[in-house]
Amino acid sequence: MTAPVKLHLRAETKPLEHRSALTPTTTRKLLDAGFEVFVEKSPLRIFDDQEFVDVGATLVEEGSWVSAPEDRMIIGLKELPEESFPLSHEHIQFAHCYKDQGGWKDVLSRFPAGNGTLYDLEFLEDDNGRRVAAFGFHAGFAGAAIGVETWAFQQTHPDSENLPGVSAYPNETELVDKIKKDLAAAVEKGSKLPTVLVIGALGRCGSGAIDLARKVGIPEENIIRWDMNETKKGGPFQEIADADIFINCIYLSQPIPPFINYDLLNKETRKLSVIVDVSADTTNPHNPVPVYTIATTFDHPTVPVETTAGPKLSVCSIDHLPSLLPREASEAFSEALLPSLLQLPQRDTAPVWTRAKALFDKHVLRIGE
């Protein structure tokens, strides 16, 4: 009989990252299937440590994955802290190093240096090439929430002020209620409800953005849905400048012309005052929203775009948006990932894992190029 798979859930280290790759619910199912699950203590995680203990997981110290036995598979969400020591375990995580992101070679080279392996969560795909688990829906939902909140803030505050920091909500209802209240305050001051243009409207992310817009009371005729059909002629697009809020939800798989540029932005006739780049391909040389250079944070959700005409323009480029709703986002993601995790004992033959390993090997070969 093969030895049980040992999963070690590491504590996330990114500030304000409350999500978790495993939840108490999915941990129980893994334990029932014969896995061993070690969970690092975490003051940040939306789930209490005790919730994992209650389902039978073994609690271990935060950061102990570094010296954990090599037969444990290390699972987490966001990239590891920037260190240089070689990585000797098998890791399951989002690593953001396969699309030529800034510093990708430094990130990726740590794995072959220690004879470790990376199974990148972004590239775990089923037989149809569809990702088995993604945070897209909640990323779009949270991004739209911050976008609408920013727009409402602009209507009720002077241009010299930016939207203050936001923090995680315990559940979706509280978030929706807060945005509704902000919108009502803007309308009370004489503003009409905003028009929202969503690019990537047919995907998970776009669906989440549209769902938020509806739930906070933005009328259907104010929600403009674009997908590949509408963008195939190539940008930049005047229609973006004519909307109040632009939400970019596309998955960037190849270079495309920019959706927006300064020629469109630097006009008195521009209506656009909020851009939410949910895709947040900030360091990607082909970012289709090339009007900002930094990833924003929950502490400072937006940065102003340097324009010479038209209303104030704020951009939100937070790269961990689903953390605004960490409990729902984690439950949905982990439940979607579970069938693949249950195949880990057969990872040498199960297609979802062999494809991910082949992709890792392919990109490792590129390091020396």
Curated annotation (Swiss-Prot):
Binding-site residues, NAD(+): 130, 203-204, 227, 231, 251, 278, 318-321
EC number(s) stated in the UniProt entry for this protein: 1.5.1.7
SS bond list: 205-249
SMART domains (UniProt xref): AlaDh_PNT_C (SM01002), AlaDh_PNT_N (SM01003)
Reactions catalysed according to its record: L-saccharopine + NAD(+) + H2O = L-lysine + 2-oxoglutarate + NADH + H(+)
Entry binding sites for L-saccharopine: 19, 78, 101, 131, 135, 279-281
Active site: 78 (proton acceptor), 96 (proton donor)
Pfam family, one: AlaDh_PNT_C
Function: Catalyzes the NAD(+)-dependent cleavage of saccharopine to L-lysine and 2-oxoglutarate, the final step in the alpha-aminoadipate (AAA) pathway for lysin biosynthesis.
Assembly behavior: Monomer.
Name this polypeptide is given: Saccharopine dehydrogenase [NAD(+), L-lysine-forming]
Organism per entry: Yarrowia lipolytica (strain CLIB 122 / E 150) (Yeast)
Gene: LYS5
